[in-house]
Regions:
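Positively charged n-region of N-terminal signal peptides that target proteins for export
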Residues: 1-4
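Sec-dependent N-terminal signal peptides
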Residues: 7-9
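N-terminal signal peptide c-region/cleavage motif recognized by signal peptidases
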Residues: 12-16
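Trp- and acidic/polar-enriched beta-sheet ligand-binding modules for extracellular glycan
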Residues: 20, 38, 42, 79-82, ...
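Exposed beta-strand and adjacent loop surfaces of beta-rich binding modules
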Residues: 48, 100, 122-126
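Extracellular and analogous surface-interaction loops
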Residues: 83-101, 152-156
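A short beta-strand element within beta-rich, extracytoplasmic domains
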Residues: 95-117
């Protein structure tokens, strides 16, 4: 009896550990307009480095996701692509344990209605913190800001927040999806 129970536990535990994380529904907000780009975010506490990792490729820096420009977009999103946000390896002591609690995203290439429809948009992502999956996020197919909130994570130097594209809304012309802006929220 004990061997059977042990065997069942050995078979069941990996499946339980691999269970899908909680699903967060993004909240659709106000329109994205150039005049309102910028403002306070986690960047008020410290900067971070953003990179894209496409399947089978090395990381590539991405500068368009937090450039406060509604006319630029990262246009290489495909299922399996990852975005990584690495916090500085050295932070002043008082900035360790800075609250990080979500992000705002302008999904798609929102430069115009026509361009928005031509590119795909990200439909669902999986969020990771230091390599551990903690949530999936469902995004709406809209040109408006979308807000994603989760329980506070106390960010520390060298930490890495990342997201993997799980699903996309197809574009009419291009096979890839786009993201215009992605702003990490926290610090206060």
């Amino acid at each position: 009896m004990t061997r059977r129970l042990l065997l069942l536990l050995c078979l069941a535990l990996p499946r339980l550990a691999a269970a899908d994380p909680q699903l967060i529904q993004a909240v659709v907000g106000h329109p994205v307009v150039q005049e309102l780009m910028g403002g306070c975010s986690l960047r008020c506490a410290f900067p971070w480095e953003t990179a894209a990792i496409l399947p089978g490729k090395p990381p590539v820096p991405v500068y368009t996701l937090d450039d406060n420009d509604a006319d630029t977009a990262w246009t290489d999103a495909v299922v399996g692509a990852k975005l990584t946000f690495q916090f500085p390896k050295k932070l002043p002591k008082e900035l360790n344990d800075t609250p990080f609690y979500g992000f705002d995203i302008a999904d798609g290439n929102i430069k115009s209605d026509s361009i928005f429809k031509q590119y795909g948009r990200v439909k669902k992502v999986r969020l990771f913190y230091n390599g551990r999956a903690f949530a999936d996020v469902a995004l709406a197919d809209t040109r408006r800001w979308q807000e994603v909130s989760f329980d506070d994570i106390m960010a520390r130097q060298g930490d890495i927040f990342s997201m993997e594209v799980l699903e996309v809304y197809p574009g009419a012309k291009y096979p890839t999806a786009a993201i215009t802006e992605l702003i990490l929220q926290g610090a206060h």
